[in-house]
Amino acid sequence: MAEFETTFADLGLKAPILEALNDLGYEKPSPIQAECIPHLLNGRDVLGMAQTGSGKTAAFSLPLLQNLDPELKAPQILVLAPTRELAVQVAEAMTDFSKHMRGVNVVALYGGQRYDVQLRALRQGPQIVVGTPGRLLDHLKRGTLDLSKLSGLVLDEADEMLRMGFIEDVETIMAQIPEGHQTALFSATMPEAIRRITRRFMKEPQEVRIQSSVTTRPDISQSYWTVWGMRKNEALVRFLEAEDFDAAIIFVRTKNATLEVAEALERNGYNSAALNGDMNQALREQTLERLKDGRLDILIATDVAARGLDVERISLVVNYDIPMDSESYVHRIGRTGRAGRAGRALLFVENRERRLLRNIERTMKLTIPEVELPNAELLGKRRLEKFAAKVQQQLESSDLDQYRALLSKIQPTAEGEELDLETLAAALLKMAQGERTLIVPPDAPMRPKREFRDRDDRGPRDRNDRGPRGDREDRPRRERRDVGDMQLYRIEVGRDDGVEVRHIVGAIANEGDISSRYIGNIKLFASHSTIELPKGMPGEVLQHFTRTRILNKPMNMQLLGDAQPHTGGERRGGGRGFGGERREGGRNFSGERREGGRGDGRRFSGERREGRAPRRDDSTGRRRFGGDA
């Protein structure tokens, strides 16, 4: 007897949602969707334990969408996400799922976007709000977000919000929501802090546990490039030129990005096309047919649009935007290496996305090697190789004698000057090279690449390795470690704003990705504060800090001048730690004891401290993309 397969219709979903799922290519529910949707449709609270990428966005979106009232122009569903990338992704997914529900609007609220843009969107009366905890809390304090009509609350990746330090904001938001709403919480792990939230805010939640099905692909050569030195679209062109591929698929996060990247590639002479959820089925099939028969070489797609895509020609996958989960990454790179062919996969990683790279590596139990951006020398070599291949192809053609006869008719410009065939060949070579010149200008010098701290890169330390402590009075005062010349900056937040040293340290460390050991003395005044940071801060970092907010107030950071040298033993913020306790060497942001301020952050100049182990085993050095591994 054939095994019965559950469909989305079997779960009780109505026609508008089923129609949207059909448009998006969803065929059958994933395990977490099959488990969660019936409970959420019946109004139960749900506690879902599943890895990201298991389909949980649809698991909570579909039933909550079905239960909302499109006529009520007020927030009825609130989704909390740890990052703006995930918030945008969830908002787009819910927009797609509700495309056939008349009058339903979705808004994403996250830091970095202008408030006036978000306020205009909120005035339209969206029924669904997706946002990061910090920005949602800002709107609640301003009175611009009304949750009095809320019927459904979702905490997506709750353990990640805990890891990033948002859990207090999450609890503050949840405490302001009126009783009687439905709550769904999803987390890959279940630490005690998350358990505490479930006990305090959830009503007899139905637990759903789904095991991860991630598998690795040893037949696919994988690598990543840290975004640095040029824009991603410019770097993409370099990588495509350096790599030999039959066909490629470029994965991006949003529909707009598919169009932007496709336009950039078309400008550079690549035969490419976008594939996104706004395309009708006929156009989608036509685009895929062009890719299969060789009329199209590069496809730029979102995860949803690429669902079910199977084209043997694809030999290269570029993750232009890093996926938010490991399973999506595996699904993406699985588009190459089909039918026994070798495949290559490249991942673009921005500095603030390094945790996502670590998650992928941990889940897949492998280390993805880093590659360098192809330089001018490599590009010149590749262009010459491709041009030589075209010349060789013409040398094998049968009608060369006709063209050889034409050579005698090409006369030199000066009378009596003999025709030099080598010079003539060089002139023809220059004419035939096209827009991609065979002689590539050397790369402009770039600032040294900065090294960025990643908590997971610190090796375990045994407390017994510290050696004897000795009597306190016998120990010399701890001297401030030499981190180079410092400069003094002023920020426009002070004691009157309720700011504490820990708020400033957190903002600088998180927004600038700077290790706390490079943050010097901080002094709090009534209306402002001063902070010492390493000399040579790049202009874009200072500009970013100018816009960064602490307790909802812009820092407006300004350089005052060089910091005065200090005697040994001085302490930041009057010699107290982040919580007011006296520090011995300080603590890192995860609460672990840090003797002598251990950690591996970066300076603005990009220099590494001597005596430190490298972040990963780089004994073989970085690989060149497109070169020999």
UniProtKB/Swiss-Prot annotation:
One GO term of the biological process aspect: ribosomal large subunit assembly
E.C. no: 3.6.4.13
Residue interval(s) of motif DEAD box: 156-159
Places the protein is found: Cytoplasm
Domain of life: Bacteria
Molecular function as annotated in GO: ATP binding; ATP hydrolysis activity; protein homodimerization activity; RNA helicase activity; RNA strand annealing activity
Entry GO CC: cytosol
Record-annotated Helicase C-terminal domain positions: 232-379
Alphabetical list of PANTHER family matching this protein: ATP-DEPENDENT RNA HELICASE DEAD, DEAD-BOX ATP-DEPENDENT RNA HELICASE 47, MITOCHONDRIAL
HAMAP family to which the protein is assigned, alphabetical: DEAD_helicase_DeaD (MF_00964)
Name of this protein: ATP-dependent RNA helicase DeaD
Species of provenance: Escherichia coli (strain K12)
Gene: deaD
